[in-house]
Amino acid sequence: MKAQHHFDPQTLMEQARNILRQNDRGGYTVPTERLYPYQWNWDSAICALGWQSFDEARAWKEIRMLLKGQWLNGMLPHIVFHQDSPDYFPNADVWNVSEACFPHGVEHPPTSGISQPPVLATCVRKLWEAGKQTSIENSEVKLICEKILNWHRWFWSARDPENTGLVRVLHPWESGMDNSPAWDEPLARVPSTQNASYVRQDTSLI
């Protein structure tokens, strides 16, 4: 006879909220304690939905922090490096993104140089529809939506210049399916050269 497992929805909800609290870094949520110590694009958008269930103001702060990394051309990078960490490679120094990529005169954190699937628009819409609208002004939501629109326009212009309706992915990490076996065959055909030494950090944590 199979064992019967009974899950209390409220208990699971509180456990999930505790994980968000533990991974809160003062305005953004890290996916894991050490393995992923920065703010990841679509992870953060989904975390905002979790925050909204018990702290609407914190949910919107998550979005604000993510958008601090937006480039001048509208691209929203897949990692925003709000602080340094020895536990992750490649870090901001490896990406070495030029200052010219960012709006002039605006303080910003370092970022990676690739993007991720744009789930942010859907998440922001859900935040707005489910929220009480007491922690954010309409004018700020409009500004957030304009930034997201600029990101979508970047996908259209930079990743679909021939207007095919299909967005090009330049790196497996941009797909959100980093370790999918679907990448094995195409990546095997890419010539590789190693011009610098490096040490992976994640293998010591998993």
What is each of the regions a protein language model found here?
Residues 1-39, 60-61, 65, 72-79, ...:
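Low-complexity, Ser/Thr/Pro/Gly-enriched N-terminal "stalk/linker" regions
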Residues 36, 48, 109:
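Generic anion/oxyanion-binding catalytic loop in active/binding sites
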Residues 38-41, 114:
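Short, solvent-exposed loop/helix junctions and linker helices
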Residues 40-54:
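Conserved H-X4-D acyltransferase segment
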Residues 44, 63, 152:
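Short amphipathic alpha-helical/adjacent loop interface patches that line ligand
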Residues 56-145, 156-173:
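Helix-terminus loop motifs that line ligand-binding clefts
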Residues 142, 152-206:
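Extended ligand-binding clefts on enzyme/binding-domain cores
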Residues 148-149:
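Hydrophobic alpha-helical hairpins/lids featuring a short glycine-rich hinge
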